[in-house]
From Swiss-Prot:
Keywords attached to this entry: Cell inner membrane, Cell membrane, Cell shape, Cell wall biogenesis/degradation, Membrane, Peptidoglycan synthesis, Transmembrane, Transmembrane helix, Transport
Subcellular location: Cell inner membrane
Membrane topology listed for this record: Multi-pass membrane protein
Recorded GO CC terms: plasma membrane
HAMAP family found in the cross-reference section: MurJ_MviN
Annotated organism of origin: Borreliella burgdorferi (strain ATCC 35210 / DSM 4680 / CIP 102532 / B31)
Pathway assigned in UniProt: Cell wall biogenesis; peptidoglycan biosynthesis
Protein name according to UniProt: Probable lipid II flippase MurJ
């Protein structure tokens, strides 16, 4: 089997376990804290550093870092190490200062970006002052992970996010009785440290030991910095958009922020297992082809990526849509998280799932442009997405409540993907629309037997809340659905589902 296919499958496996741990974390958090005001404030505040990491670490920074690092690595190992050390040094100084400022001015920051006042503002500011420490840990971790990915080491670094969920779960079990909601805060910091430690140790093993290096005037670093600053604007817009969504949710009934946050976690399951796994493996290869000027292979990767996203996300989003009530009934409801909270979460999740395919394709198109060192086009599309998302959310929230926020995202991603498609065509990339539509048709055909399986299992007597009977039913339905899906792909002539990178593109 092709080594890139193997790498993708390994990343999918580790990401799957990471998401399962995330579900366990959400289940335990919801069981102990429910959808009350404290849980709302924690979820709202944690969403801020969790989003900031997209521009200060995992999103913008790694997208700017990896192409430059690949370029230096092709020159020599010494140049790659020098560039790596310079970026780490810059990270510690710059992001360390940002975190310090956030801690000092936690209260005015929370006053400005939230609707919380009085005691709720004091509580939110206190939680924020601790949680921002996570940004520094994850920003350093993301650089180490990028280095490992560049050397085709995917499995171990993709396993490290499990540590965050593990830290939160362990901390709640140990400290809930004494510290209440702050037990989750302790867990974020502890889990973030473990998440940093794993890729750090692996980088040491391949000869990337850090020591302070201040080559800030080197051309390669200035190129990285310029590209990163440009990308920050694009990622910042999407982050501000999501933060506005959470702010709008906080104006609705108590529990809305927690419901929205939980829906996002379950929505991110297929994103993490499939899209992020594919992008983790394919992006370094895209960057390599772009550096070498091999546009034919680069374009082949783009086209094959589109096909595999269609083949995966159409049936997966459909399965999650029809089974969402049963999944959340099993894994989320219980303790302080009521039937009403679970039903509301399922409703929001379904609205998110309508745009899952477009979300993944939007991110994939962004990766393509980052690989060719074009940060402007993704920025303009991010601006368009934000304008659409905010406008639809503000208009729709009075009519559709919390569901409007998820629908706004789905509609906005769909429009932006269509615009992205025509921009890519103008760049001269050849995309056979008939071939893509043929793959789309095959994916849609698989939905009929999948719904038949759902119709069969729906007739069973399901319990309310968690039970092993529900678990067995859901596992059986999942196994049968996956088996039937692969049979369908085989019958339809798609025998190599994960071979999205053609041999001629490698």
């Amino acid at each position: 089997m092709n080594k890139y296919v193997v790498s993708t499958i390994l990343v999918m496996i580790s990401t799957f376990f990471s998401r399962i741990m995330g579900f366990v974390k959400i289940k335990i958090f919801s069981y102990y804290f429910g959808a009350n005001l404290d849980a709302d404030i924690f979820n709202y505040v944690f969403n801020i550093p969790n989003n900031l990491r997209k521009i200060l670490s995992e999103g913008a920074m790694t997208s700017a870092f990896l192409p430059e690092f690949t370029h230096e690595k092709n020159k020599s190992h010494e140049k790659a190490v020098s560039f790596f050390r310079t970026v780490i040094t810059f990270n510690i100084i710059s992001i360390g200062l940002i975190v310090l400022v956030m801690i000092i001015f936690a209260k005015p920051i929370m006053y400005f970006i939230s609707y919380y006042r009085g005691e709720n503002l004091i509580f939110a500011s206190s939680v924020f002052g601790y949680l921002v420490l996570y940004i520094l840990l994850i920003s350093l971790s993301s650089i180490f992970v990028s280095v490992l990915n560049s050397y085709k080491i995917f499995f171990i670094p993709s396993f490290s996010p499990i540590m965050l969920s593990f830290g939160i779960i362990l901390s709640i079990f140990l400290f809930y009785g004494r510290f209440g909601i702050y037990s989750a805060v302790i867990g974020v910091i502890f889990g973030g440290f473990l998440q940093f430690l794993i890729p750090f140790a692996n980088c040491l093993m391949i000869g990337f030991a850090w020591k302070p290096t201040f080559y800030f005037r080197e051309k390669v670093f200035l190129n990285f910095l310029t590209r990163w600053l440009r990308m920050i604007f694009g990622f910042s817009i999407s982050i501000i958009t999501q933060q506005i969504s959470f702010a709008l949710a906080s104006t609705l009934e108590i529990g809305s922020v927690s419901i929205l946050s939980n829906a996002v976690v379950y929505y991110q399951l297929p994103v993490g297992i499939f899209y992020i796994s594919i992008a983790t493996v394919i992006f370094p290869k895209m960057a390599e082809h772009a550096v070498l000027g091999n546009n034919i292979k680069l374009n082949a990767l783009l086209v094959d990526g589109i096909k595999i996203l269609l083949l995966i996300f159409i049936p997966v989003s459909f399965l999650m849509f029809i089974w969402s009530d049963y999944i959340l009934n099993l894994f989320l409801m219980g303790g302080k998280f009521s039937i009403y909270d679970t039903q509301k979460t399922a409703s929001v999740l379904k609205c998110f799932l309508l745009g899952l395919l477009f979300y993944s394709m939007f991110g994939f198109f962004q990766k393509y442009y980052f690989s060719i060192r074009d940060a402007k086009t993704p920025f303009y599309l991010s601006v368009l997405f934000s304008i659409l998302d905010i406008a639809i959310s503000v208009f729709g929230i009075n009519y559709y409540g919390l569901n409007a926020l998820a629908l706004a995202q789905s509609i906005s991603f769909m429009i932006c993907v269509i615009v992205f498609y025509f921009i890519i065509l103008k760049r001269g990339v050849k995309i056979d629309l008939i071939e893509i539509l043929f793959v789309l048709l095959k994916s849609i055909i698989t939905l009929f037997p999948l719904y038949a399986i759902y119709f069969f299992f729906e007739k069973f007597q399901w319990d309310v809340g968690f039970s092993f009977k529900n678990l067995y039913f859901l596992m059986a339905a999942g196994i049968v659905s996956i088996f039937v899906l692969f049979i369908c792909y085989s019958v339809l002539g798609i025998n190599k589902l994960f071979r999205y990178i053609r041999r001629d593109a490698l």
